[in-house]
Structures are given as C-alpha cells and as structure tokens.
C-alpha cells in the first residue's frame, strides 16, 4: 500500500509539473506572439519599414505567421499593410525577385478577395518593389493605379500621402514634369486637409 501511495503521489507530482511547464510555455509563447504582433502593428501605425525590435527577417517570418489570422478575421487593410511590410523587408535585404514575386501574389490575393484597399496596397507594394529594383516606369504605373484606387476609398488620405513623395520623386527622375505638377498639387491638397 505504501508503494501505491508513493507511486500515486509521484504521478500527481509529475502531472502538476507537466501542467505548470505547459502553462509557463503557453504563457511565454502567447507573450512572445503578442510582442511580435505589437512590433508589427507599431511599424504599420508609424509608417516604418523596420525597427530594432523587428528586423527584416523577423518581419517576414512574423508577418507570414500573422497573415492567415488577419485573412480569417477579414482584417484586409491590416493584412495588406502587413504584406506591404513583408515586400519592403525582402527589398531591404536585397532580395528583389522575392519582393516583386510577393507583391504580385499579394495583388492576386487582393483581386480574389475583391478588396479595393488590398488591391490599392498591393499596387503600392508592386510599385515599391519595382522602384527598389530600379524599374521606374513600371513603378510609376503601379503607383498611379494605387492612387486612383485610393482616391475612391474614403479615409485613405494618409495612405495616399505615404505614396506621393516617392512617386513624385520618381516622376522627376524620369522627366514626367507635367505629371509632377499635377501630383504635387494633389499632395499639397491632401496635406492641407490632413496635416
């Protein structure tokens, strides 16, 4: 009977240890995931491409882990802002083919979801990827598409303000001076309305 009691006590102790370890591990994993999501959302909210807390490789990994959840919850604006961040991370580490490929897949997904904001952000991502690959003319076309779509989406003025400076600079570099004037005026108007 003593052996049974010792064995039973030992089993109970093992279960308590296992539950404790599981709880600690689950808490640590949840806490880590929360920190990752928080770091990515900080980047999106502050229009940053990376930070000390979220270097390029981490952005790619965490973003790919978080994207299915955002898609499932139909958080399309945040989903495509996150995917834009992933494209930028690929480009920042010099992987232009991956950046362009990811941006194109992003565009296809946005079309399949029939998400205007997703299509606009995907067009922007394609423009950014092309610009980073020194392909200015295709970048210009992608930026134009993004801006045309964003014009039709209420509340997207901040996104337009983020695109316009590099778009205008690209127009200047490629000698599209008539368009520069048009988009400079647009930028001034947007900035006056949303300082």
Describe each model-derived feature in a short phrase.
Residues 2-13:
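Bacterial N-terminal signal peptides that target proteins for export
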Residues 26-195:
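A "functional boundary" signal
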Residues 11-22:
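Bacterial N-terminal signal peptides
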């Amino acid at each position: 009977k003593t052996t049974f009691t010792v064995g039973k006590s030992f089993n109970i102790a093992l279960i308590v240890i296992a539950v404790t370890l599981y709880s600690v591990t689950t808490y640590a994993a949840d806490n880590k995931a929360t920190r990752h999501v928080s770091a990515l959302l900080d980047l999106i909210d502050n229009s940053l491409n990376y930070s000390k807390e979220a270097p390029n490789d981490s952005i790619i990994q965490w973003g790919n882990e978080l994207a299915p959840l955002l898609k499932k919850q139909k958080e399309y604006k945040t989903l495509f802002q996150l995917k834009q961040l992933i494209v930028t991370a690929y480009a920042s580490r010099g992987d232009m083919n991956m950046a362009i490929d990811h941006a194109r897949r992003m565009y296809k997904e946005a079309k399949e979801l029939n998400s205007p904001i997703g299509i606009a952000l995907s067009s922007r991502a394609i423009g950014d990827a092309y610009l980073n690959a020194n392909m200015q003319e295709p970048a210009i076309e992608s930026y134009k598409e993004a801006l045309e779509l964003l014009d039709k989406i209420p509340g997207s003025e901040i996104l337009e303000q983020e695109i316009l400076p590099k778009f205008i600079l690209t127009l200047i570099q490629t000698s599209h001076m008539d368009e520069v004037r048009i988009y400079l005026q647009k930028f001034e108007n947007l900035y006056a309305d949303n300082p």
